[in-house]
A protein has these predicted regions:
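Enriched for short, Lys/Arg-rich terminal
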Residues: 1-4, 10-28, 32, 59-89
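A short, surface-exposed loop/turn module that caps and links secondary-structure elements
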Residues: 35-62
Length: 89
């Protein structure tokens, strides 16, 4: 099953900030993460961490030491909603 990826306003701003940083390794890793999320959002080559203190299941994957990709899976719509991609939670 292929999941559709959607982005929150904050995630779009975060991705733009990462692009402006010019860090090619971060952008390459981010692109790889998006491909993995489409195929298997619950597992992957990077460690998937379930975040606490959220009412809805919210997951995170490491982009690099500084940044995390935070997302939710909407099974009823076969969608992954990316919440943020800049900073550490």
């Amino acid at each position: 099953m292929i999941y559709q990826i959607k982005f929150s306003e904050e995630a779009l701003k975060d991705i733009e900030r990462l692009k402006e940083s010019g860090n090619k390794s971060v952008l390459k890793k981010l692109a790889k993460l998006f491909l993995e999320l489409q195929e298997h959002p619950y597992t992957g080559t990077m460690q998937v961490e379930q975040l606490k203190h959220y009412e809805v299941q919210t997951l995170s994957r490491r982009i690099n030491r500084e940044h995390r990709l935070v997302y939710r899976i909407q099974e009823q719509f076969v969608t992954v909603l990316v919440l943020s991609a800049f900073g550490y939670y």
